[in-house]
């Protein structure tokens, strides 16, 4: 038993060290294959000897079952926010004031102000026992299970007293874009994604979203003879907490201010979003003397970067309808350059936003890039308001079908609920044929609009009857000739085999994006089973809360929708999970094998995966591992993957497998 216990301890220490170098230092020490083998060895030992599982084992980070809510706990010391400074003059005054009050020429530490979610960790006897959100500053929610899924955060530290460690949890730019691309309703910015993820009741979802963290504060540091902020940061590093590598220390006020101004210009190069820099007095000995207001400490201040604001004239408001019937208010603007991009429109969200901000046509408005991506109207420059401004009226009726718009309880958005609405149906058909859904190439929004207006395609069902309307289509000014029409029909026919997940995505059910659609397809296996699911059954599923469950339940209990499904099935559109009822090539050497694809091909990766899945019921890997059966190599494959495959004697094949 001692040999097994020692082996487990060695593996835990080894993997923790590899995790630290990979997730904190960004310096991987071994390749993925070696890491996976070590991890699997540890998993097997723990499976065989569950009584020897250690609390800080890397295997204990994976997400668990969903919880009903988070326990609220008091902070040992208040989690205050920082006072903001918007000019270097304010920073200079802050420094001068502290030097005067302390009668010293002090050092100041400059740290990044990460645009994320504040977190306070508590360790007792060296073990992480609580992870509290800021909450109202006095009371926070304990999101411990979610925080444990963040691999850069130590589950244990070599310190036996009770201690708090504070920092920020965030999502980097690349991860934010990748996750948002999978969501039907994307997050407005990375901070919202981090906040929503860390408070998700299902820690499995949190684990999938690759949250990151940086730490910077030990509230009771003086009790442990830590006397400066630089000592705090050094201690955190020794305990293997992730700490920012962009921290600077200054005694000269002018050098510090020059650094702030220079940093603003290079912040775009960072992999994560900042909304400023924090300037802290380095000496903790003066913290108690300086004290704090009810909201902010007096020994630190946040220098906020100048947002990318420009002013222009709002010339009109465009009101459109989305595929779910949601009403979108968009400001039409006089062309203006914003952060290197020509902007002629910006979102106004909804009418409540317009009313609250008192935004009018012909106003001069301030626009900015929210989350550095989407232009938004921030406010009106009232000093430039003239007598020709026109008050924007709330849209009462759908601009497309003239149906009365409705507001759903607890939502600020308006909706057109008429399922025969022209614009709503055009948007739905356009989404149905998109790559995210049924991936029917050859149809764009303009073509769909003309087909709709000529009564050739009025719903997604009509797409599958288009093959019988060749003469009518060719007569339209669509630049579609005989050859293109035949190719379009082939694409439509091929989409029938896409399976339940893509079909469910394309139906445009509110709150159901492609990721949730795949999960539902894997669970229910076919549309009929989903159709007959109870509300309680839906609520119990991962990724499905009450709001989403009600949306699904209501959609599948609408007679019109049931008829839609029936009509699709009559046209041989597959409503089962993809592998079911497919004539797989079961005698092939490729049947139910695992492939890795590398290099470029004449069709997309998604198309390759769809083709091979339909033929061989296969799976796919992103890295070369012993579990990979075949590597498919195209033009300019990744040499590292090819060499690794050769080392493992994995057969390397080409695109002949699907041609």
Curated annotation (Swiss-Prot):
Catalytic reactions on record: NAD(+) + (deoxyribonucleotide)n-3'-hydroxyl + 5'-phospho-(deoxyribonucleotide)m = (deoxyribonucleotide)n+m + AMP + beta-nicotinamide D-nucleotide
Domain of life: Bacteria
Annotated BRCT domain residues: 585-655
Residues that, per the record, bind NAD(+): 32-36, 81-82, 111, 134, 168, 280, 304
Keyword Plastid: no
CDD domains for the chain: LIGANc
Protein name per its UniProtKB record: DNA ligase
Active site: 113 (n6-amp-lysine intermediate)
Cofactor(s) for this UniProt protein: Mg(2+); Mn(2+)
Family the UniProt entry places it in: Belongs to the NAD-dependent DNA ligase family. LigA subfamily.
EC nos: 6.5.1.2
Transmembrane parts of this sequence: none
Binding-site residues, Zn(2+): 398, 401, 416, 421
CC per GO annotation: cytosol
Keyword terms, alphabetized: DNA damage, DNA repair, DNA replication, Ligase, Magnesium, Manganese, Metal-binding, NAD, Zinc
Function: DNA ligase that catalyzes the formation of phosphodiester linkages between 5'-phosphoryl and 3'-hydroxyl groups in double-stranded DNA using NAD as a coenzyme and as the energy source for the reaction. It is essential for DNA replication and repair of damaged DNA.
Gene Ontology molecular functions: DNA ligase (NAD+) activity; metal ion binding
UniProt cross-references to Gene3D superfamilies, sorted A to Z: 5' to 3' exonuclease, C-terminal subdomain (1.10.150.20), 6.20.10.30, BRCT domain (3.40.50.10190), DNA ligase/mRNA capping enzyme (3.30.470.30), Helix hairpin bin (1.10.287.610), Nucleic acid-binding proteins (2.40.50.140)
NCBIfam families: dnlj, PRK07956.1
One record GO biological process: DNA repair
Gene: ligA
């Amino acid at each position: 038993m001692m040999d097994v216990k020692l082996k487990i301890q060695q593996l835990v220490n080894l993997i923790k060290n590899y995790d630290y170098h990979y997730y904190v230092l960004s310096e991987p020490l071994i390749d993925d294959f070696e890491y996976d083998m070590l991890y699997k060895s540890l998993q097997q030992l723990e499976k065989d000897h569950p009584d020897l599982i250690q609390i800080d084992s890397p295997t204990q980070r994976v997400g668990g079952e969903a919880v009903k809510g988070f326990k609220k706990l008091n902070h040992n010391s208040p989690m205050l926010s920082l006072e903001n400074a918007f000019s270097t003059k304010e920073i200079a005054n802050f420094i001068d004031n502290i030097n005067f009050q302390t009668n010293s020429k002090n050092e100041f530490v400059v740290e990044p102000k990460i645009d994320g979610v504040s977190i306070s960790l508590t360790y007792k006897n060296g073990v992480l026992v609580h992870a509290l959100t800021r909450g109202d500053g006095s009371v926070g929610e304990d999101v411990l299970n979610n925080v444990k899924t963040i691999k850069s955060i130590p589950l244990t530290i070599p310190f036996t007293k009770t201690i708090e460690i504070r920092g920020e949890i965030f999502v980097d730019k690349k991860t934010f874009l990748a996750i948002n691309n999978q969501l039907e309703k994307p997050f407005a910015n990375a901070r919202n994604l981090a906040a929503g993820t860390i408070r998700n009741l299902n820690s499995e979802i949190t684990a999938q979203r690759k949250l990151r963290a940086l730490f910077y504060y030990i509230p009771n540091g003086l009790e442990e003879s830590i006397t400066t902020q630089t000592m705090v940061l050094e201690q955190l590093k020794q305990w293997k907490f992730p700490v920012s590598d962009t921290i600077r220390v200054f005694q000269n006020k002018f050098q510090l201010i020059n650094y702030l101004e220079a940093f603003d210009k290079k912040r775009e190069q960072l992999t994560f979003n900042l909304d400023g820099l924090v300037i802290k007095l380095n000496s903790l000995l003066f913290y108690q003397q300086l004290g704090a207001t009810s909201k902010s400490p007096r020994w630190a201040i946040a220098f906020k970067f100048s947002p990318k604001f420009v002013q222009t004239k709002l010339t009109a408001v465009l009101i459109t309808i989305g595929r779910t019937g949601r009403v979108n208010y968009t400001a039409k603007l006089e062309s203006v350059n914003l952060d290197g991009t020509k902007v002629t429109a910006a979102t106004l969200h909804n009418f409540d936003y317009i009313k609250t901000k008192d935004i009018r046509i012909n106003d001069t408005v301030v626009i900015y890039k929210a989350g550095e991506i989407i232009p938004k109207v921030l406010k009106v420059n009232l000093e430039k308001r003239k007598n020709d401004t026109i008050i924007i009226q709330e849209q009462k009726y759908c601009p497309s079908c003239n149906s009365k718009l409705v507001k759903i309880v607890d939502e600020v958005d308006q909706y057109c609920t008429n399922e025969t609405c022209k614009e709503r149906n055009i948007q739905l058909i356009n989404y149905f044929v998109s790559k995210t859904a049924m991936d029917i190439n050859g149809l764009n929004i303009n073509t769909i609009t003309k087909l709709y207006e000529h009564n050739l395609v009025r719903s997604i069902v009509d797409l599958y009857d288009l093959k019988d309307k060749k003469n009518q289509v060719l007569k339209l000014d669509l630049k579609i000739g005989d050859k293109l029409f035949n190719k379009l029909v082939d694409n439509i026919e091929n989409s029938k085999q896409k399976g339940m997940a893509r079909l469910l995505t394309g139906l445009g059910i509110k709150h159901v994006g492609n990721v949730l659609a795949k999960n539902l397809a894997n669970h229910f296996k076919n549309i009929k089973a989903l159709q007959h699911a109870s509300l309680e059954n839906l609520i119990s599923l991962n990724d499905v809360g009450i709001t989403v469950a009600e949306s699904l339940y209501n959609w599948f209990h609408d007679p019109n929708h049931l008829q839609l499904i029936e009509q699709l099935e009559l046209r041989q559109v597959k409503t089962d999970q993809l592998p079911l009822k497919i004539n797989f090539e079961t005698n092939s050497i490729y049947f139910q094998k695992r492939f890795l694809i590398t290099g470029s091909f004449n069709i997309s990766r998604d198309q390759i995966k769809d083709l091979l899945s339909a033929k061989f019921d296969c799976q796919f890997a992103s890295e070369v591992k012993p579990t990979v059966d075949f590597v498919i190599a195209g033009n300019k494959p990744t040499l590292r993957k090819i060499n690794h495959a050769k080392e493992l004697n994995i057969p390397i094949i080409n695109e002949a497998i699907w041609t």
